[in-house]
Amino acid sequence: MAARRDGWLGPAFGLRLLLATVLQTVSALGAEFSSESCRELGFSSNLLCSSCDLLGQFNLLQLDPDCRGCCQEEAQFETKKLYAGAILEVCGUKLGRFPQVQAFVRSDKPKLFKGLQIKYVRGSDPVLKLLDDSGNIAEELSILKWNTDSVEEFLSEKLERI
C-alpha cells in the first residue's frame, strides 16, 4: 500500500494556512483601529499606550488587544499641552465609595496644581474637566477607577505645578 504524499497537505494543513493568513491580516490591520472604532469600543482618541499597561491592575487584560490597537505612544506627542485649569467634580456624599479619589481630594496634593478646583456636585461620580484658556471645558474624563497616583500623574502632565 502506497503512502499518500498529500498527507501533510490535507485538510489540517489547509486550515493552518488559512488561520495563519487570517492572523497575519488581522495583526496588520488591527495594529491601529480608526478613531470611530475606538470610540465605539469605549476608548478615548487620546489614549496613551502606557494606560494599557495598567489594565492588569484592574483585572481587565481581555481589553489589552483593543487598547493597544487604539493607543498612541507618548513619543507621538511632540508638545506637551498644558491646560489653563481643571475642575475635579465629585459628590461629597459618594466620596467614600471612591477611596482613592477621596485620598487625593482630602490631601494637600490639589494645592500643588495651578488652576485646579475641587467642586462638590450632588450625585456626581468623580469627573475631571480640563479647561482651555477661555475657561471652557476642553476635555472631560471619568476618574472613577483611577488611583491617587494616577490622578496626580495625569494632572502633572496636564496642568502647571505651583
From Swiss-Prot:
Subcellular location: Endoplasmic reticulum lumen
Pfam families, per database record: Sep15_SelM
TM region positions: none
CC terms in the record's Gene Ontology section: endoplasmic reticulum lumen
Assembly notes: Forms a tight complex with UGGT1/UGCGL1. Interacts with UGGT2/UGCGL2. Interacts with RDH11.
Protein family membership: Belongs to the selenoprotein M/F family.
Role of this protein: May be involved in redox reactions associated with the formation of disulfide bonds. May contribute to the quality control of protein folding in the endoplasmic reticulum. May regulate protein folding by enhancing the catalytic activity of UGGT1/UGCGL1 and UGGT2/UGCGL2.
Protein name per UniProt: Selenoprotein F
